[in-house]
Amino acid sequence: MFGATQVSKAQFLDKARQAREERKGLKERDRAAIKIQALIRRFLCRCRLQKEIRQEVDDFLEGTEKGSVKANALSIFRISRKLLIIFQISQDRMRFEKLCRCILNSMENDNEPKVWFVSLALSKDLTLLWIKQIKDILWYCSEYLKQLKPDILQDSKLITVYLTMLVTFTDTLTWKILKGKGESLRPAMNHICANIMGYLNQKGFYSVLQILLTNGLARSRPSLSKGTLTALFSLALRPVVAAQYSDNLLRSFLIHIMSVPALVSHLSTLTPDRLSVIESNGLFHKFILFLSREDQCSDVCECLEGSHTLCLLGNLIHLGHLTEKVLEEEMFHFVSVLTQMLSYCQKYVSQKKSNLTHWHPVLGWFSQTVDYGLNESMPLLTKQLQHLWGVHMIRNLFREVLSKKLAENQDVSVPVSQSSSSSPQNNLPMKNLFKRAFQKSASVRHILKPIGGKKVDSPEVQKVCNICVLYQMALTTLTQIRLQILTGLTYLDDLLPKLWAFICELGPQGGLKLFLECLSSDTEESRRLLAMLVLFCDCSRHLITILDDIEVYEEQISFKLEELVTISSFLNSFVFKMIWDGLLENAKGETLELFHSVHGWLMVLYERDCRRRFAPEDHWLRKDLKPTLLFQELDKERKRAQLLLQYIPHVIPHKNRVLLFRNIVTKEKEKLGLVETNTASPHVTHITIRRSRMLEDGYDQLRQLSQNAMKGVIRVKFVNDLGVDEAGIDQDGVFKEFLEEIIKRVFDPALNLFKTTSSGDRLYPSPTSYIHENYLQLFEFVGKMLGKAVYEGIVVDVPFASFFLSQLLGHHHSIFYSSVDELPSLDSEFYKNLTSIKRYDGDISDLGLTLSYDEDVMGQLVCHELVPGGKSIPVTNENKISYIHLMAHFRMHTQIKNQTVAFISGFRSIIRPEWIRMFSAPELQRLISGDNAEIDLDDLKKHTVYYGGFHGSHRVIIWLWDILANDFSSEEKAMFLKFVTSCSRPPLLGFAYLKPPFSIRCVEVSDDQDTGDTLGSVLRGFFTIRKKEPGGRLPTSSTCFNLLKLPNYSKKGILREKLRYAISMNTGFELS
């Protein structure tokens, strides 16, 4: 019973709670309904009111347009007030435009003050309300300006309306109410205008102007009219002038206005009067002083980021170019500001592409976000930047250097080498680079050598150092126009020699000692001095690279040859000291940049001297470097010795480098187990070669060998024409004969794998060698054979064209390499024709040339296009330098590219490229073909081995050496050496290194009857006993063994006659 009561009570309470909640929910729903109804009524009321107001505004504006309503200032004010209450930018666009036109029309009314909208500013009751209203109207004008595109016709009309509003009500100049008696009110009205401008600035007015200017000017052709640009610039300038050039407004003007791409360029083109306003207000002067104070420049740069900082830099440079007087007065601050801005940009310049970098057309890979909307304006920005290295600016900045007079010496005569070659030219926009009157500067002055005497802390030196820092910063920051900068800096023919003269005078003892001291000093002064050296090296290297031999050796543009000797000596010592003193081992940043700059200039001079000598004998050697010490350090793997060999091997005597090369090869042979030892013998590869098919059999059997097997011992067995094995054991001699024969055949121009240059004495891959089946595999095989000869120290008489040797060394990958430079080594006549085009003063298009090359290929005329569509592109004065380079590159690279790549691949499979980088092109030729010096008979006699009874005191041997020394010419001695060894040149390291050694053997019978030395033959030879008079026989040779077979002649005259005949006929083994 009690349990049922408890259940009913719980149910009752539950029902009561539910009832309360229902009542509460009903009340809330009623309240919500009432609130929603109120909101809807309010919304509908507001919509109705807005509609009524808009209708009223529309009726008013339509009436004013038709003339049915005469609008005065008060009616416009009231209607504007109503519109501004309900104003929405997107909905009231057309309405607002009509209102602005109405206001502007009122301002143009004649002699009716009550109509002028500005008259309300004079009403005590309405002044504050009017100011508030005009501020709002002008800001809405600004908001619309942000959205408009100047290149759209309709938008450009609206821009004119809104700009006119802003121009009209931010300056009292056009207010008719202030004319006459109202002039006394102008100060008060000016104050109101300043107040309006202040309000707009606080709201971000400069950002609006920046957007509109950028939209209209950041393109190849500006879309802003003269009037629009004038209005925009006037509006931008007003707050600055009104605030009496306060730091805050100067900063805003620089960040938002002067950072607009090529603004000054467009002003000078469209509205030159605005530039006069800049000048009259001294703006450039104020900009430079502001940016030079404390951290203002870095603050502005941080706000702008890289792309826009570059735009500001371009505009400042352009202003500096236009205002020469201010530039002279504020040169120190101008240079300092530009350096700081370039330094800021440089922090974000990257050397390579990565996930964090973006491509910039002037800065290259850039680690900040790049505004690609500015790309169209980059050509104009580049033109602005070019003023920095233009003649006008360089003359101003380097005035102290250029004012220096170089002492003249009329009696100096300069020996000029007779060989001819060319140097690279640079296809850059400076069209008249090669037509300058250079000749006057270099040919008559004293040689400039380090003399010292100028204090490095003097104002003059500090100024020049700062300028050099600026240009060096430009070179490392503006990476994509670096060549333009270098061309500009080298345009004045006397800048570089005078800068060198300036460097020579620095410090108490002259340049070298001072700069070496700077290397060990980490001070700001040292860095600036080294920047001067870097700039000099970069510019000089660029100049010498683009000059040809006539300009360097005969006209001696900028530098005399003796000065190049002095400079190269300075550079050689400087680089050597940097390496040997350990400064390069952990170098980075500025030190590494310094080294690459000085080393690059040094190597350009060295390579030019290798092609055509201007320096004295042994000029490049370091007398204080002992080769034995260097070799010891190389054995210990000391870093400085390795770097020396990598960067300046030329300081080591050539013979020592050849010894080093041979040591490297020997060590590799030992490492690969290719050398006979007491415990092991090297693996031997045996091949059988038919004499009638020597090339084919050699190719088939050797091309499949592994790299190590090719480097190892190869034994050759010859099979004669009858298919019978030839007698004899190959102890390197037969392989030498095989190798020499292979090389002789493949390099024979008749085979058409290689052909001779125009001079007929040098070889390079034949462009038509593709007629051979598997010709690329053949070239790779030939490369291996030549590599094997060099590897084994076998000299072969194969004279290569200089340009081909440069490619074998990898020089063509250098940024300083030019095909034109090497062209004479291929075809001197062709080179003369091309350089005559370069020097042609008339209109080159009259010659009817195109960017193509016509060639007779096996009876058919083939047209090779140098660029895509080249046969339809005429050669003009603008592209003729490019044409010369393209033509040279085609002849020496493109045309034989595949053959060269295959040959080099084969050669490098035997000879590593780093082994031969220590040699120049002529030195590599000597490594391949032996020394081109006179044959040293004493050395040959000392290292000759005698057989068959001959000995050093034998009568025939004495006659032989006497004939060679006194009766034979140099040419005949070379023929004699070729007769015995197959090569007319002696080994590089002397005859001690000839393998097999030079040998002379006494023979009694013909070669086909010769069975070698016997006891009887040796005794007869030793005691000069003859079976019969051998006067009818000729001397013969076995070149595979470097063996001269000499009959035991009875008279010296017979020996002379027979030997001369034999070597002239080059009979050798064949005449036996």
From Swiss-Prot:
Among the entry's GO cellular component annotations, what is one?
A: postsynaptic density
Q: What does this protein do?
A: E3 ubiquitin-protein ligase which accepts ubiquitin from an E2 ubiquitin-conjugating enzyme in the form of a thioester and then directly transfers the ubiquitin to targeted substrates.
Point out the gene that encodes the protein: ube3b
Q: Which residues form the active site?
A: C1040 (glycyl thioester intermediate)
Q: Which reaction does it catalyse?
A: S-ubiquitinyl-[E2 ubiquitin-conjugating enzyme]-L-cysteine + [acceptor protein]-L-lysine = [E2 ubiquitin-conjugating enzyme]-L-cysteine + N(6)-ubiquitinyl-[acceptor protein]-L-lysine
- Report a single Gene Ontology molecular function: ubiquitin protein ligase activity
Key words, A-Z: Synapse, Transferase, Ubl conjugation pathway
Name the InterPro entries for this protein: E3A/B/C-like, HECT_dom, Hect_E3_ubiquitin_ligase, IQ_motif_EF-hand-BS
Q: Where is the HECT domain?
A: 706-1072
Subcellular location(s): the record lists: Postsynaptic density
Entry's EC annotation: 2.3.2.26
SUPFAM superfamilies in the cross-refs: Hect, E3 ligase catalytic domain
Its name, as the record gives it, is Ubiquitin-protein ligase E3B
Q: Which residues form the IQ domain?
A: 29-58
Output the GO biological process annotations, alphabetical, semicolon-separated.
protein polyubiquitination
**SMART domains in the cross-refs:** HECTc, IQ
Q: Pathway, according to UniProt?
A: Protein modification; protein ubiquitination
